[in-house]
Amino acid sequence: MKFVVLDTETTGLRAYYHEMVSFCGIKLDQDLREIDRLVVKIRPLHLQRADSEALRINGYSPSRWADAMDPDEAAPLIAEFMRDCTPVAHNWAFDRGFILALFKATGRTDLRIMRRGIDTIALSIAAFGPYGLKSYSLESIGSMLGWPKQKHRAEADTVMCYALFRLLYPMSIKTAIKIQSIVLYAKIRGILNPYRAMLALLLSFWCQHVQP
């Protein structure tokens, strides 16, 4: 079995009205090792429909998308990349809607590649739910795990989703024990974080005034 961990950035939240402006997919073998990667920028055809906040978050600008592909060029690349793979995404329903909208808008009929995917939100709920995590966004999970801040760029977020997928899949007793250890470490780190500056200040004072 092969997987494609993926993320999309869009001009808003409504598939079939807003548009996908970037896609990243990381293809994995059965051992969850990366074997290929696809990063595509897509030129929006109906920018007047775009949500300004969505464009701000994903960093869209005409100059940064000057080399973007037209939807007719991007769709076959994405379709071929995903073929015979199980999709993996953080909120798969959202990404699936925009990929399907792109395929249908460009007249593609090979929609069977959009098979049922694996949602890392569901995996996260199963793994972190018992520990009272209040949000299952990539940003919240990454913050708890001490990962770099989410950038809302397709490739960066796909890399983060891939790391989360490797951490949580497949769910097993071994994985559960690993998660328990990670959450415990995160809680300890969270308790200590507010005191780091104070400890650094005390250490500096000690070095300057207490040592002989």
How would you name each of these model-derived features?
Residues 117-133:
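Short alpha-helix plus adjacent loop in nuclease-associated cores
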Residues 178-211:
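Short hydrophobic helices that act as membrane-entry/anchoring signals
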Residues 10-12, 122, 160:
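Short, glycine/acidic-enriched loop or turn micro-motifs at the edges of active sites
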Residues 86-93, 97-103, 132, 136-189:
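Acidic, Mg2+-coordinating catalytic module of metal-dependent nucleases/exonucleases
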Residues 1-100, 108-114, 138-145, 152:
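Conserved non-catalytic scaffold segment of RNase H-like nuclease domains
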